[in-house]
Each structure stands twice: as structure tokens, then as C-alpha cells.
UniProtKB/Swiss-Prot annotation:
Na(+) binds at G72, T75. This is Fluoride-specific ion channel FluC 2. One of its GO terms (molecular function) is metal ion binding. It comes from Moorella thermoacetica (strain ATCC 39073 / JCM 9320). It is found in: Cell membrane. Keywords: Cell membrane, Ion channel, Ion transport, Membrane, Metal-binding, Sodium, Transmembrane, Transmembrane helix, Transport. It catalyses: fluoride(in) = fluoride(out). InterPro entries: FluC. PANTHER family: FLUORIDE EXPORT PROTEIN 1-RELATED. One of its GO terms (cellular component) is plasma membrane. Belongs to the fluoride channel Fluc/FEX (TC 1.A.43) family.
Length: 122
């Protein structure tokens, strides 16, 4: 039955990523992939928040649906990689490096902040 929880969370995460990335892309013009950056950073925060919840705070199936399902489908390593490689291919190595470092370091920072937020809330 766990597969059903992961699948439902995954559907919701995929749709959230698609809609949010498209919405941001239509409002913020430029060459920086802000949609992917935003979903990956906010996903890192959500995962940090979820991981810091006290054991048993949420039912195991809900944690599975939210963590593996929703956040796993919401964030996108493949799009991040594609955008980075495309920047490098376009001769924009410095921009690719800044995007990569911002994504990775920002993700770690936001996961930690999510962890801290959960600790102060619960």
C-alpha cells in the first residue's frame, strides 16, 4: 500500500512543480532558470522541515507520501543538470558555476533552515 501513498504524493509534487515553474517563467523573464531554482530550494526547505519532525508526529504513510512522493517529484535534479549543461554548452561556464553553487549551497542552507523551523515549531 505504500506505493499508493508515494504515487499520490508524486502526482501532487509533479503538478506543483509544473504549475509553479510555468507561473514563475511567465512572470520573470531572463536567462536564469528561476523556476527550477525556486522549486529545488523550496523543496529542500520542505524536506528539512519534514525530516526534523519528531518521530511519529505524522503517520508513516503520510511521511512517505510527503517526503518520497511529493518532495521527490517536486524537486528536479534532471532539469537542474540539463540547464547547467546547456549553460556550459553555450559558453556560459561562470553562470553555470554560479547556478550550480547557488542550487547546491542554497539547498543545503534551506534544508537546514527547514530543520530549524521544525525544531522551533514542534
Amino acid at each position: 500500500m505504500a506505493w499508493l501513498y508515494v504515487g499520490c504524493g508524486g502526482i501532487a509534487g509533479t503538478l506543483a512543480r509544473f504549475l509553479l515553474s510555468r507561473w514563475l517563467g511567465n512572470r520573470v523573464r531572463g536567462t536564469w532558470p528561476l523556476g527550477t531554482l525556486f522549486v529545488n530550494l523550496s523543496g529542500a526547505f520542505l524536506l528539512g522541515l519534514l525530516l526534523a519532525l519528531p518521530q511519529g508526529r505524522l503517520p508513516a504513510n503520510v511521511t512517505l507520501a510527503l517526503g518520497t512522493g511529493f518532495v521527490g517529484a517536486y524537486t528536479t535534479f534532471s532539469t537542474f543538470t540539463y540547464e547547467t549543461v546547456t549553460m556550459i554548452g553555450d559558453g556560459e561556464g561562470k553562470r553555470a558555476l554560479a547556478y550550480s553553487l547557488g542550487s547546491i549551497l542554497g539547498g543545503l542552507l534551506l534544508a537546514w533552515l527547514g530543520w530549524l523551523a521544525a525544531g522551533s515549531l514542534f
